[in-house]
From Swiss-Prot:
A GO BP entry: arginine biosynthetic process via ornithine
EC number: 2.7.2.8
Organism, scientific name: Chlorobium phaeovibrioides (strain DSM 265 / 1930)
GO CC, any one term: cytoplasm
Residues carrying the site annotation Transition state stabilizer: K42, K252
Main location: cytoplasm
Catalysed reactions, as listed in the record: N-acetyl-L-glutamate + ATP = N-acetyl-L-glutamyl 5-phosphate + ADP
Protein family (similarity comment): Belongs to the acetylglutamate kinase family. ArgB subfamily.
Protein function: Catalyzes the ATP-dependent phosphorylation of N-acetyl-L-glutamate.
Subcellular location field: Cytoplasm
Name this protein carries in UniProt: Acetylglutamate kinase
Stored Pfam families: AA_kinase
Amino acid sequence: MDHQACNDTTPARKAPQAAIGQVLIEALPYIRKFEGKTFVIKYGGSAMKDECLKNSFAQNVTLLRKVGINVVLVHGGGDAITKTAEKMGIKSTFVHGKRVTDSDMITIVQMTLAGKVNQDIVRLISEHGGKAVGVSGLDADTIQAVPCHNAETLGLVGEVAAINTAYIDLLCNAGLIPVIAPIGFDDEGHVYNINADDAASSIAIALKAEKLIYVSDVAGIQAHDAILRTISKTQAADFIEQHVITGGMIPKVISAFQTLDGGVGKIHLIDGKCIHSILLEIFTHEGVGTQFIAEQGNDDNQ
């Protein structure tokens, strides 16, 4: 920056400069607190489709890693799987939101998730200065699976049985960002399609993560026409009973508190359609999404 620019003190210039400075100062205690901690981020929804949002996400993840936070990504890719299946003349069928997965479909799932989707995320992070490594859940037994409880209907859809935390820790300790495709296999070598939310939750619990962050298409938990910045287990139960929280949000909320019970520090639900939503949620006092906490009163983003 030249000398003239440094001495530009017009109100129009000073206002944004002051705002930027305030944000950076506000972030400092959070950066100190979270250095060396592990964040598991589930990446999905519109943030995986829009180019601007994809770049914003990659920048956010790279910055987290640069300030000393261990970042573990678990990604979805349902739309990409459906498109690939259509190109191959295979129709996708869903039961209660879960993809029916036969032997042909599991091949497409592997090819799409562990292939193009995973590699695109790794490439994008690398373009923004991060060091990411693609991980299939099959690699080094990262995700060990068992058939889901209604396998007779869903086919090769699995549930997480165990996580190889040693392998993930090895990658994080090397300064890398593991980008994990949610597929796994059982003791007999059968490969399973695993729900990305469930995989992220299991990985966060196994790693004893400080935070699990869901990057989604909703701004957070809505109650009485406003987004709740914080919700406790007691509040959630009351809102479900009062039909304030309804429909598909109920299992998400229940799952979030089960993850908290598993030992994860906090759960965050944020809107992936908001530019830099991860940084704003983690490094500012107000945040931009909803954080789930075990007890009311611990309601800051720390």
